[in-house]
């Protein structure tokens, strides 16, 4: 019994010692851990403060660069608003569509109509594709456009009643091809597969277009409207209307988007002329005048003796560079006063200097068309420099030397704005005339 008490006392003493040791450890070592924890927290706070300070410095630096932290969200919101507005516009437009017209492009001038005036796109984008098509809506009229070598009479389906046929009537071989298309359209009329037909014609440069007269409705034919290039004496503003020559789409001249540099950069050349200088022509006289007083050193001049129907990639780039880097583009007459160069210069904001004289042939009836040649451009207020003789050029070049860059920038803006307005106005006039002729005047 005594032994048991001794063991119990020993156990209690041992437990007391263990408790004392634990208490001593907790008192002396437990308190030492707290400062470590506090130090860790302080370190984290210090690191956070440093990071905050660093972010503050970075933020200040970004703000000094006018950085907008909400720029991405704002741009996304703006894109969403634009997309929504376009959807609303397209929906309202579709609801108002009353007419459908298909354009058959069988001449390169059709690409100027579709891509430059209508600002339409084509699928596929490949210019060598056999079949290309696109769609556009102008006012209440839905247009579809087809072009390419695979567009052949009798080999494509016709699901519209109203057609605009774009043809080339410049020379005999082209006239034969155009006539085949007109005969095909006439047969469609007879079988009531078509109701109305208009023709956009790349006419002869001498305005010798008598071959098409028999097809006009006014002469017992079936063509309601004729839009024709050059200053034809037939133009009456009713069923025969003038159409612009446009740019050389057959040479792959592109749709040009105006840029900041196009408007504001100093251009190294006062003028340019890249083209064919025919013997005993005003172009040859122009070349001689440019050589006087070193004027050819101020201009980008490259003349060739023979006309080339196609451009190489290099020659096309050189030509476009000349337009882009010249304040003026010299536009001497060729077979006709109107030339592709005029419209191509407008595309690049280079002021056309146009030789304003009538050429040989049947174009321009001066007794009734006092503004001929180029009466369409003049009627639309083209901001060009018109001259009657290239002897006027040296004085023009001298004046150019005194014009400030700011004045030139303003002049470019005026030209580019006018050209865009010119194309837009044509698109709406074209549509208004079609709607009036095809639909309004033919309502029963």
Swiss-Prot record:
Top-level taxon of the source organism: Eukaryota
Keyword flag Ribonucleoprotein: no
Membrane topology: Single-pass type II membrane protein
Cytoplasmic-side segments: 1-9
Record field: transmembrane: 10-30
Pathway assigned to this chain's UniProt record: Protein modification; protein glycosylation
InterPro entries for this protein: RXYLT1-like
A GO MF term: ribitol beta-1,4-xylosyltransferase activity
Subunit-structure text: Forms a complex composed of FKTN/fukutin, FKRP and RXYLT1/TMEM5.
Family: Belongs to the RXYLT1 family.
Protein name (Swiss-Prot/TrEMBL): Ribitol-5-phosphate xylosyltransferase 1
């Amino acid at each position: 019994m005594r032994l048991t008490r001794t063991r119990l006392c020993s156990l209690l003493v041992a437990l007391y010692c263990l408790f004392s040791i634990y208490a001593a450890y907790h008192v002396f070592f437990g308190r030492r851990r707290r400062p470590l924890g506090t130090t860790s927290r302080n370190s984290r706070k210090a690191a956070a403060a440093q990071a905050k300070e660093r972010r503050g410095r970075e933020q200040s630096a970004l703000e000094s660069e006018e950085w907008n932290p909400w720029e991405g969200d704002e741009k996304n919101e703006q894109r969403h608003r634009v997309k929504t507005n376009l959807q609303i516009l397209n929906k309202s437009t579709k609801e108002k569509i009353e007419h459908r017209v298909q354009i058959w492009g069988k001449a390169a001038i059709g690409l100027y109509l579709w891509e430059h005036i209508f600002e339409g796109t084509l699928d596929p984008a490949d210019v060598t594709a056999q079949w290309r098509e696109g769609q556009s809506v102008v006012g209440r009229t839905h247009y579809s456009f087809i072009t390419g070598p695979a567009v052949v009479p009798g080999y494509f389906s016709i699901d519209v009643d109203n057609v605009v046929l774009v043809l080339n009537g410049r020379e005999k071989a082209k006239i034969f091809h155009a006539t085949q298309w007109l005969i095909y359209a006439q047969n469609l009329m007879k079988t009531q597969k078509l109701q109305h037909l208009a023709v956009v014609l790349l006419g002869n440069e001498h305005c010798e277009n008598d071959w098409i007269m028999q097809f006009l409705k006014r002469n017992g034919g079936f063509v309601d409207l004729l839009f024709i290039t050059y200053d034809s004496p037939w133009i009456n503003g009713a069923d025969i209307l003038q159409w612009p020559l446009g740019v050389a789409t057959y040479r792959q001249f592109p749709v040009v988007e105006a840029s900041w540099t196009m408007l504001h950069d100093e251009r190294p050349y006062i003028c340019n002329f890249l083209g064919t200088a025919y013997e005993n022509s005003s172009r040859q006289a122009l070349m001689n005048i440019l050589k006087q007083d070193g004027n050819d050193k101020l201009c980008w001049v490259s003349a060739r003796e023979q006309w080339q129907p196609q451009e190489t990639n290099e020659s096309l780039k050189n030509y476009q560079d000349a337009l882009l880097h010249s304040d003026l583009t010299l536009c001497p007459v060729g077979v006709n006063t109107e030339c592709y160069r005029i419209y191509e210069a407008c595309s690049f904001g280079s002021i056309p200097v146009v030789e304003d004289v009538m050429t040989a042939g049947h174009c321009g009836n001066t007794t009734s068309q006092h503004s001929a040649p180029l009466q369409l451009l003049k009627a639309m207020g083209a901001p060009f420099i018109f001259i009657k003789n290239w002897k006027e050029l040296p004085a023009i070049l001298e004046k150019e030397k005194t014009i400030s860059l700011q004045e030139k920038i303003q002049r470019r803006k005026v030209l580019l704005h006018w050209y865009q307005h010119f194309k837009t106005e044509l698109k709406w006039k074209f549509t208004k005339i079609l709607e009036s002729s095809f639909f309004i005047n033919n309502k029963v």
